[in-house]
């Protein structure tokens, strides 16, 4: 059984680092378009698990967590999405289905967890996570700050 794993992908070999930087640029463009402000990745890593390994509810550091679902052959019936919970951790507020090329963004202090995959799933549930803070040097920050 494979347990949760985390890999700091910004410290990976050059080719991987180049691809991750391209992915980050695309992720940040979506963040700018949807939230009106640029972010900086504080941490980035790949996370993966298989059937029988469940994520625990937790909160993240930083301002925003962005989770990218990279598996093109993922079947949504295998589940394995991400759930967000109320502040007391009792009720599920939102469930994001695992879907290829989806980006799920939410405030980092929100209680969340990776959901289990079904027994018939023989694939590795893999996500790429960016933990982000506001980019106070980016031109979008001043307008964002003044609008708050």
Stretches with model-predicted labels:
Residues 1-37, 147-148:
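Non-heme Fe(II)/2-oxoglutarate
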């Amino acid at each position: 059984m494979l347990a949760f794993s985390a890999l700091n992908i910004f410290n990976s070999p050059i080719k991987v680092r180049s691809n991750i930087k391209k992915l980050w640029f695309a992720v940040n463009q979506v963040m700018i378009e949807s939230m009106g402000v640029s972010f900086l990745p504080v941490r980035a890593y790949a996370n993966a698990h298989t059937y029988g390994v469940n994520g625990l509810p937790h909160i993240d550091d930083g301002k925003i967590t962005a989770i990218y679902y990279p598996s093109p052959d993922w079947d949504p019936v295998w589940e394995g999405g991400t759930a967000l919970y109320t502040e007391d951790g009792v009720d599920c507020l939102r469930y994001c289905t695992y879907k290829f090329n989806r980006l799920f963004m939410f405030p980092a202090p929100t209680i969340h967890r990776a959901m289990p995959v079904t027994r018939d799933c023989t694939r590795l549930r893999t996500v790429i996570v960016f933990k982000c803070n506001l980019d106070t040097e980016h031109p979008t920050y001043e307008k964002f700050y003044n609008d708050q």
